[in-house]
Every structure is written in structure tokens, then in C-alpha cells.
Amino acid sequence: MGLPQSDVVTLPVDPVQSIPTYDAALAAFNQLPHVRLLFDSGAGASPTGSSNPGDPYPGYERSFSSLPIPGTNARTWYFGPHGVLTNTPPASGGINWFSSNAHALPLTDYGTNTGTGGLWGNASQWQWKWLQSPSGTAVSYVSAPLMANTTVIGSGAVDLWVRSSTPDVDLQATISEVRPDGNETFVQNGWLRASERKLSTNSNNMFKRLSTALEPIPTFTAADASPMPAGQFVKVVVPLYYEGHAYRVGSRIRVTIAAPNGTQPVWSFSQTTPNPSGVASIAFSQSMPSSLVLPVVPGVSAPTPFPRCPSLRNEPCRPYRAIVNNTAQ
């Protein structure tokens, strides 16, 4: 697990490991739910009751029969004026833009100690450096405070209407939770090179399944790669990696669009475009509805309070700071 020897960790009892025969162990394993989700990893207590923020224990867990979770809804929030996310496409459209520069932030968001301990220890050893994007290098959109706990399980997407000053542009989407206490928690990322925006229309793709609103699948073939048209907006869907996160009542959901880098602890993209920089514009309107789509699972409660900041493993938190988006006519 990469834990330092100074961190005393007691693992929970394995329900299968102590069964003496293979057949009996297999039968017991097959009786377990197929999907087990550990929420708020780092915010829980050990089997002995001890609790140190960042230790590898979940705040709570839930089990399900399959993934995607039955009953999952594709919940859409639309980009709007003044950096808001709304429930419907905005009545009045607009354009925001940012300078696309993959070196606007440090390439990674952690300190130098990423081996045993440090990143993998408890929160007292962390050296997160998750920084806010410099002015003009990102655009951001934030929802209204949530009226109920909103549990998101699975992949998602950010549907963007993009215009680029260069023939190609790399896009990074960052999803975070803006808490009522003024802190912001990182949740997940997604990336796409805009020239590779063509989505698969059948199951003949790398995942061998159909592309959906919650799991868009680019073809990633050379034949389908296409430069960005000069002076025109085109739809670019950025797939999001999986998340299992409860956005608690009163929190706001934030999506930030920027060039890649600055949001992962130990790796970054060494080859990015444009190089060194360009201008990416994002449109939002009735006819060009840029949006965030997340897989919301109804009826999944969050029985614990907000986790301490910091405490979640590989989900750094920081004081929230609003971004004033650049606007264009």
C-alpha cells in the first residue's frame, strides 16, 4: 500500500480469506455483491476505532449488484453567463475564452515525496500543491447549492462547443466540490485532444460497446482525426474518468476547463498542443449548449458529515476561489 512503517494500520477482516477450502471460499465470494464502493477514503476509522485523517479507511460504503448502478440518471448542468451551471440551457448565450497553456501551472500538484509515506501516508505527511489557475488560463462554471445529497457513481462527460485559434487544442476538464465551509475538494479529471473529437457510432471501438452520453467513446483513429475549423465552433465531448463521490447538501459542483497539467500528483503530459499557447473559446447558448453530464444515483445517502479538509486520499482540498471568466462578443 506504500504506507510508511510509522503509520499503524489495521486492515478489516477479509470475509473470504479465512475459509479453509477453495470451493467454500469461491462460493462465499460469489455470494458477495458484485460492486462494493468505499466512499470518502481517508475519512473513516480503523476496525479498532482509531482514526487519523488520511488513513486508508472509508467514511462509509455501499454495495450494488452491477455497474452502471441500476437506476443511474444522466444529470445535466448547462454552462451559463457569469460562470454558473444551470438546469436548462441559458436563455441568453455567450462566449468565454482562456489562454491555453499547459505550463500555466506546475506540471504536477504534489511535492517531491511521492514514495513510501508522503503521498501514500496519512494527511499529516501530505504536501499537496493544488493551485488555482492563473487569471485568464481557465474558465470555470459552478452550480447553485445542492438541495439534497447527490451521489455520483461512474463516468461522465463535459460537452463543449469550442473554437480554437490554432488547428488543435488539448482540453482538460476538472470536476470539484465547492463546500459550504469555503473549501474545494478535487474529484476527477478528463482530457481530450480536440482533433480526436469524433465519437464512435457503433461498438467497433476500443471498449467494444456503444458510446453514450455518460460514456462517450472517441474512435481515436487517424482517419477520423480532424483539425479544428478556423473561426468556427464545433462540439467537443471530453470523457470523464470514473468517480464515486457524494456531493453533500449545500455544496456546489464546479467544472473547470483549461489546458492539461497541474491536477495530478506524480505524472503530467509532456507533449501538448498548442505549443506554447493559443486561445480556446467556449460557447454556451440554446443552439450550442455546453454542459456537464454526471451519473447520479438516486436514493444513495451520505450518512456521515463533510470529511475533514484534508483527509480524502488523492482528493486534495484547498480554499475555494472564484474565477472571473474572460468574455467575448
Language model features: what each stretch is:
Residues M1-Q329:
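C-terminal, loop-rich substrate-recognition/catalytic regions characterized by aromatic stacking residues
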